[in-house]
Curated annotation (Swiss-Prot):
Gene Ontology cellular component terms for the protein in this record: plasma membrane
Membrane topology: Multi-pass membrane protein
The entry's keywords: Cell membrane, Disulfide bond, G-protein coupled receptor, Glycoprotein, Membrane, Olfaction, Receptor, Sensory transduction, Transducer, Transmembrane, Transmembrane helix
Encoding gene, per UniProt annotation: OR4C15
Designated name of the protein: Olfactory receptor 4C15
Glycosylated residue positions: 3
Transmembrane segments: 24-47, 57-78, 100-119, 139-157, 195-217, 235-257, 269-288
């Protein structure tokens, strides 16, 4: 079936049509975006600058997750911030397809990375004596390759489905971004089958990975019965951060993509949560509960202060 699109651009309704609310949206989400990119890139730089952290699979995955969060947020948030300054918010057909592809690509990669991080914690807690031999560089590289490939396949399937839809008008999207269900409502054809394919593709990757995560942590919790109280506390503290991130990311995704298409006002709020707020919260969750990351950040800060003092002394 050849794409029969006549629409050259879409109009986004955004979060609100009220000018006062749009001003608040601009200020709040500009601050959130700066904090998101700054916080996540700080973790990336910290891990890359700390050899002791970089050789650890857990921190390797954490750095990769932070990079993904910065990219994922940058796909949607900057345009949303700029659009809040305008009464009419438009996006070209090509721009809409690119946004849709990038959103699902980075989300698909992140889903698999979170699953890989759960497996890393499973091996570290349940098979500590074999951790170094199992979680070696080769396996970490394979897991990253699987994540990139899985995200690419997922986004390619979504975009190929969307390109088959004819858009002949209207062109108003009741959202602040291009997403599958709002686009299905605008298609000039019966989208029942396409809606089911969205559920199968997006819902499948969410539910399968979420199930693997649940199994991993169920096994971890069962294995903690044989650990000392100190060992249990350390394991729970390490896993707690990851569990919080998993819940914050997966629950909104499953809510949005595992149901049939319908006009549901809470979709916008769910999208704000997993696209904008979740990448902001991830650095806070991991750094506040992780002594090694905080110590590495202090060392980097101290080195910067030393370099700054040396430059001042040279000027004098």
């Amino acid at each position: 079936m050849q794409n029969q699109s006549f629409v050259t651009e879409f109009v986004l309704l955004g979060l609100s049509q009220n000018p006062n609310v749009q001003e608040i949206v601009f200020v709040v989400f500009l601050f959130v975006y700066i904090a998101t990119v700054g916080g996540n890139m700080l973790i990336v730089v910290t891990i890359l600058s700390s050899p002791a952290l970089l050789v650890s699979p857990m921190y390797f995955f954490l750095g990769f997750l932070s990079f993904l969060d910065a990219c994922f947020s940058s796909v949607i948030t900057p345009k949303m911030i700029v659009d809040s300054l305008y009464v009419t918010k438009t996006i070209s057909f090509e721009g809409c397809m690119m946004q849709l592809f990038a959103e699902h690509f980075f989300a698909g990669v992140e889903v698999i990375v979170l699953t890989a991080m759960a497996y890393d914690r499973y091996v570290a807690i349940c098979k500590p004596l074999h951790y170094s031999s199992i979680m070696n560089r080769r396996l970490c590289g394979i897991l990253m390759g699987v994540a990139w490939t899985g995200g690419l396949l997922h986004s390619m399937i979504q975009i190929l489905f969307t390109f088959q839809l004819p858009f002949c008008g209207p062109n108003v999207i009741n959202h602040f971004m291009c997403d599958l269900y709002p686009l299905l409502e605008l298609a000039c054809t019966d989208t029942h089958i396409f809606g089911l394919m969205v559920v199968i593709n997006s819902g499948f990757i969410c539910i399968i990975n979420f199930s693997l995560l649940l199994v991993s942590y169920a096994v971890i919790l069962l294995s903690l019965r044989t650990h000392s109280s100190e060992g249990r506390w350390k394991a729970l503290s390490t896993c707690g951060s990851h569990i919080a991130v998993v819940i914050l990311f997966f629950v909104p995704c499953i809510f949005v993509y595992t149901r049939p298409p319908s006009a549901f006002s809470l979709d916008k709020m769910a999208a704000i949560f997993y696209i904008i707020l979740n990448p902001l919260l991830n650095p806070l969750i991991y750094t506040f509960r992780n002594k090694e990351v905080k110590q590495a950040m202090r060392r980097i800060w101290n080195r910067l202060m030393v370099v700054s003092d040396e430059k001042e002394n040279i000027k004098l």
